[in-house]
Each structure stands twice: as structure tokens, then as C-alpha cells.
């Protein structure tokens, strides 16, 4: 049966093959571009602004950029603030 399918199957045209390959390449590039070049500087700038108001450890700030679909990016910022000191 597989032999019969082999001889009766139609070959894909080169345009559809090229399109599939291009889609694979584009998807792979999107995955490899995990962190934009400006993200470290953005983290430093955000940390600098936070330090104007609260004394925190730089390790307590995390910045992540997540891709959702083709045209949506989500910037997630997590800051662990120190506990408030008691005033007398």
C-alpha cells in the first residue's frame, strides 16, 4: 500500500517548500532573539530610579521580556522591597 501511495502522491511545488522552510527559519530566529540589546540598560535605569526612593539590593530586581504572538511583548518587572522600618 505504501508503494502505491509513493507513486500516486503528488509532489509539492517549490514555492510551498520554500514557504515552509522560511517559516521554520523565522520561527527559529524569534526564539534565538530572547533578550533585546536594550534590556540590561533598561534594568539599570529602573534600578537607579527605585534607589532614589528606597534602598534595595540590585539582585532584588528582575526584568523579563516575554513575546506573546507576533506583535505583543510583555515587560515583567519584579521588585522585592525591604520591610518598612519602625519609626519612633
Swiss-Prot record:
Annotated TM spans: none
Disulfide bond residue pairs: none
SUPFAM superfamilies: Cell division protein MinE topological specificity domain
Keyword match Glycoprotein: no
Domain of life, source organism: Bacteria
GO terms classed as biological process: cell division; regulation of division septum assembly
Transferase found in the keyword field: no
Pfam families: MinE (PF03776)
Keywords of this entry: Cell cycle, Cell division
Described function: Prevents the cell division inhibition by proteins MinC and MinD at internal division sites while permitting inhibition at polar sites. This ensures cell division at the proper site by restricting the formation of a division septum at the midpoint of the long axis of the cell.
Similarity annotation: Belongs to the MinE family.
Protein name: Cell division topological specificity factor
Species per Swiss-Prot/TrEMBL record: Cronobacter sakazakii (strain ATCC BAA-894)
